[in-house]
Amino acid sequence: MKISVIISTYNCGALIVKALCSLVSNQTPACELEVLVIDDGSIDNTRQIIKKFQAKVSFTLKYFYKKNGNWGSVINYVKENRLANGDWITVLDSDDTLKPNTLNKLANLVEKADYDLVVFDYTKCWKKIKLKIHTYPTWWKNMTRELQKQTPFCIPLGKFLKRNLFYKLPKLKEKVSFQDALYTASSLKLAKKVRHVNQSGGNYHFKRAGNSMSIPWNIKRFSAELDICKDLIRLNAQEIALVHLLRQQFRVQLKEKQIQLAVTRDFNFSGFSWYTRCFLWMVYQTMLKRYFYLQTTKQ
């Protein structure tokens, strides 16, 4: 089995070493590893670091340099040039790492059953705090219903797509942030068989300086967040759009601009774990309901 790992990077030469080392420790006879480093216009020493690693590792490590266009442009670049050749494809940000044995666990799973998408839990790291995030309820394994497949934890880390699913994904927007949420939501919508693994597949470094979560709240960020919410609603993932409104500054600007988001059905949190369901229902009823309105369709 061949696995393609896409590493999106921009001026992260000091951090990408850990990401690459985590792949070295994941090598297994069950998997042929192909690593594609897509440099989104860095001006640091990323190229030199990758060149040194290419001489040391036993797996395929390719480096591509492109003009800066943000995260969505990296995925588009890989798809347009058909760079990922693995049976399974995943995306790893340059400041994140895979947990040991993740690829071996994946290989054992997909050998026994036919899945379109395999979703691991992950560990959220912030300063010295580490918290395991359960992408789905711990006892859930196989998801087929559309609303059941939704998850508010929509970073690409630990999500492995079959190659044909990856290349079916819609083109992402470029030169804007937060396209990873749309990437994940589209993957979940198109996947017919989703397998959840109740095991952390990687470490996600939250609010690192320079990543999308550390971007200041200006008009550009507001517009990007608003567009993502509208796109998620179009994907029938309005519950995930609601999660974006947990950010206070986003709500403040929506209120100032008197913007409400149109949805075409009532909110349904039944696909989430009981604690996530209770929390989202409560904040929707008490805080967020005012930011949405039900758009009736004409007969």
From Swiss-Prot:
SUPFAM superfamilies: Nucleotide-diphospho-sugar transferases (SSF53448). The keyword Transferase applies. It is an enzyme of class 2 (transferase). Keywords: Glycosyltransferase, Transferase. The keyword Transferase applies. One of its GO terms (molecular function) is glycosyltransferase activity. Its EC number is 2.4.-.-. Belongs to the glycosyltransferase 2 family. PANTHER family: GLYCOSYLTRANSFERASE, GLYCOSYLTRANSFERASE 2-LIKE DOMAIN-CONTAINING PROTEIN. This is Uncharacterized glycosyltransferase MG060 homolog. It comes from Mycoplasma pneumoniae (strain ATCC 29342 / M129 / Subtype 1).
